[in-house]
């Protein structure tokens, strides 16, 4: 167990207070930059600073994380160059989730597969898209594109949109992964609208859920409400859960406007503390190993 202090991008991270399982995977990270090499999309809604592969590796080596999933971030639009180059640097340690559009060819998808991409992302929430019909159309289109490759579809959306997609999801053979607790609000508890649908979809085995970025869904990520919601999910279907840090933690600060043309500071999240919190949510080492290592190995084809 490593007890040395760790600081990455000026953010300190606690030492782990548990034994990290072998082949543990951080299933939700982003890489940004160098900004001179990778132009941002003109349609972005924020401007990130640089967060490079060496920074990510410094974090993961310090926290004993052996594997990583790079999720293509929205400021680059459908230009996956930064994510794909990061995967080339990571080699077998890394997997990726890309963002595509109707112009992406099958040959491009095959090339992405070769460097480690294993899914595509529909980022509805960042774009403020909550239209259920649009979401269903996008879901059907996306799964048709990735099914021949054996990939999954990752969605960033909320509980209401997720619930509206239940019938469509039940017709798919492609796994669907929901980011960030599917934005279930911890303070609303496990009886909040549509939380039962999330549990039902998890029980069906058709969807996966990322226990990632609790600061996005709880006023107090260490509080009783967050703990209750997380433990309910873990007890329900631990073989369909993943953990992700959301490093380097984009997303703006609460109450502050976002700017397209001004570098937005990342949230100073302590990822060592986040991992220790996860370990406290879980009752036993076998379940922790399942969430951190076994499940990612299966979904991301490590």
Spans of features found by a protein language model:
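An N-terminally biased module of ancient metal coordination in phosphate/nucleic-acid-related enzymes
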Residues: 1-78, 261
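Alpha-helical scaffolding within the catalytic cores
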Residues: 52-56, 104-107, 162-163, 190-198
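Conserved, mostly hydrophobic/aromatic
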Residues: 28, 60, 83, 112, ...
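H/E-rich (His + Asp/Glu) clusters that bind or coordinate divalent metals
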Residues: 4-11, 192-302
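Hydrophobic faces of well-ordered beta-strands that scaffold small-molecule active sites
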Residues: 24-29, 68-71, 94-98, 120-122, ...
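A generic "structured core" feature
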Residues: 25, 29-31, 138, 142, ...
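Glycine-rich phosphate-binding "P-loop"
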Residues: 39-50, 67-71, 113, 118-134, ...
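Active-site gating/metal-coordination segments in enzymes
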Residues: 3-12, 77-160, 167-169, 208-219, ...
